[in-house]
Regions:
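Secretory targeting signatures
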Residues: 1-30
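N-terminal "domain-start" segment that seeds a small globular fold
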Residues: 26-50
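Conserved redox-active cysteine motifs that mediate thiol-disulfide chemistry
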Residues: 53, 61-78
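Short pre-active-site segment immediately N-terminal to redox-active cysteine/selenocysteine motifs
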Residues: 55-57, 62-65, 97, 142
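Hydrophobic beta-strand anchors of alpha/beta hydrolase catalytic cores
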Residues: 58-59, 90, 146
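Thiol-based oxidoreductase modules, predominantly thioredoxin-like and allied folds used
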Residues: 87-103, 119-130
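Short, internal strand/loop/helix patches
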Residues: 107-151
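Thiol-/selenol-based redox modules, centered on thioredoxin-like
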Residues: 142-179
Length: 179
């Protein structure tokens, strides 16, 4: 009897996970000004979103304890490899700091990618503040959440949930073509 209950429950959970992964999200191509924020980089330095104006910015609101966020790293690595760092910068910000995620957990995740799958994550990583300022502003619907900002800091694109490289690349190509 118990095993009969588990099978439908597992199937339901698998279906629910697939549904949420595929259909979660909100895609908008409207231009609005991104609200500036600060974050703590892995080296302890405080950085601001506006420090990166002049380049197209891919903001990845993520968490180390989020499996879809880890899958998103593979797509962001393709972006890193295929776009000039003079044109596009990637910021992966762990927004679950208020849930206990730390610099060492984030660094361990970066190291695990290098050691376990031979992949260097060569972009800027940082942590939200304890109040969850970035999470509340940019990732209140969940993680991963991806934003693309134009060179002036306007939001060009946003998506909640895992996003494929080809979609990200097409959005980057469009915003880069606008100058």
């Amino acid at each position: 009897m118990i095993s009969g209950i588990k099978k439908p429950s597992v199937l339901f959970l698998v279906f629910l996970f697939i549904f949420l992964t595929v259909f979660a999200g909100c895609t908008e191509e409207k231009i609005t000004t991104g609200e500036d924020f600060s974050f703590t980089a892995l080296d302890g330095e405080t950085k601001h979103l506006n420090d990166f104006y002049g380049k197209v910015i891919v903001l990845d609101c993520m968490a180390v304890n989020c499996q879809p966020c880890m899958f998103q790293m593979f797509e962001l690595k393709k972006i890193s490899e295929n776009y000039s760092k003079n044109d596009v910068t990637i910021l992966s910000i762990d927004v679950w700091v208020s849930s206990g995620e730390t610099v060492s957990m984030l660094q361990d995740t970066i190291d695990a990618f290098k050691n376990q799958v031979n992949m260097t994550l060569d972009w800027t990583f940082g942590l939200d503040d304890l109040q969850g300022t970035i999470q509340n502003t940019y990732a209140s619907a969940g993680v991963p959440t991806l934003y693309i900002f134009d060179k002036k800091g306007n939001i060009y694109y946003s998506h909640v949930g895992y996003e494929d490289y080809l979609i990200i690349a097409s959005k980057l190509d469009m915003v880069l073509s606008q100058g």
